[in-house]
Amino acid sequence: MICGIDEAGRGPVVGPMVIAAVAGDGERLLQLGVRDSKTLSPTKREVIYARIIEVADCVNYVVVEPHIIDEYVRRRMLNSLELDFTARLIELCPAELYYVDSPDVNSRRYGDALSFITGRRVVALHGGESVPQVAAASIVAKVIRDRLIDILKREIGDFGSGYPSDVKTIEWLRLGKIPVECVRRSWRTLRYLNT
């Protein structure tokens, strides 16, 4: 069996990052319409997500809150964060082979590190969504993160996308409208706002 692992929310200044793992038959996943989550509308992602849950042998995810991300970033170890949490997911989803979308410029180094830590066969790829299980993990991660962001928006209002390039997000940050625990304090975006 093959397991794919991918993340959603690595770049935003607001909200968590979600890393997901999906193990199962690649052909069955493709029949569901699984492909890179970025190419699917939110509605289509939700529909496919529900189907993934039904047919996959294993679906698991971890939510990495902003304060945890900040701890790693302050030590200049964002890739290590993904390595640590991906290793946890590998332990939770048994498979013969793991395909992981690599955050490291050197995907082989990243895959080798995961293999060493977990004792499992891991192949790290850039743009791993060509592997159905990775594409499915991409959808799961994106749906979970979107749901968490929607909850936050219902609580405090629409702050935009949460990305540093979003003018609305920056304005909300500048005005202090987003709760501190929801913001990645280590992001350069905040340093620029505080100068």
Swiss-Prot record:
Record flagged with keyword Metal-binding: yes
Substrates-to-products reaction catalysed: Endonucleolytic cleavage to 5'-phosphomonoester
CDD domains noted in UniProt: RNase_HII_archaea_like (cd07180)
Compartment annotation: Cytoplasm
One GO BP: DNA replication, removal of RNA primer
EC number(s) recorded for this UniProt protein: 3.1.26.4
Family matches, as Pfam families: RNase_HII
Domain of life where this protein originates: Archaea
Cofactor: Mn(2+); Mg(2+)
Keyword entries, A-Z: Cytoplasm, Endonuclease, Hydrolase, Manganese, Metal-binding, Nuclease
Key word rRNA processing present: no
GO molecular function: manganese ion binding; RNA binding; RNA-DNA hybrid ribonuclease activity
GO CC terms of this entry: cytoplasm; ribonuclease H2 complex
Gene3D superfamilies xrefs: Ribonuclease H-like superfamily/Ribonuclease H
Cofactor-binding details, from the entry: Manganese or magnesium. Binds 1 divalent metal ion per monomer in the absence of substrate. May bind a second metal ion after substrate binding.
Binding, a divalent metal cation: D6, E7, D101
Residue ranges of every copy of the RNase H type-2 domain listed in the record: 1-195
PANTHER family linked to this entry: RIBONUCLEASE (PTHR10954:SF23), RIBONUCLEASE H2 SUBUNIT A (PTHR10954)
HAMAP family for this protein: RNase_HII_A
Stated family: Belongs to the RNase HII family.
Role: Endonuclease that specifically degrades the RNA of RNA-DNA hybrids.
Name listed for the protein in its UniProt record: Ribonuclease HII
Protein source organism: Pyrobaculum islandicum (strain DSM 4184 / JCM 9189 / GEO3)
Gene: rnhB
